[in-house]
């Protein structure tokens, strides 16, 4: 695993970099970058950490490609800065609304390896530094951990 290595990339629904299977069962931090038609540069959309980033990205790709965007959500999606991100979701179905929304809004997407360990602090630092638009620090804005 290499830092800043592209794990998967597509432009206009055409695969540019095939999914790198060596990331299956690999621990680490990934970032999803996207670009809208009218934009020239990619922006950071999401950052995630996992003990198996390859399998997590495969699940995310499934939602991007095979789950249709729905407009029947009831909870406004807000990021870690309490900014409304343009869509609403149904309880317990955040990912099934988020990824189809991203697929609808962005013409170019790439998953990138950021770090080779699942480290929450590094995930936070990267997400804040890159201003990951949809990132939520693990929970909706203003929601505390329950013990």
Can you describe what each PLM-predicted range is?
Residues 1-147:
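Boundary/linker segments flanking structured domains
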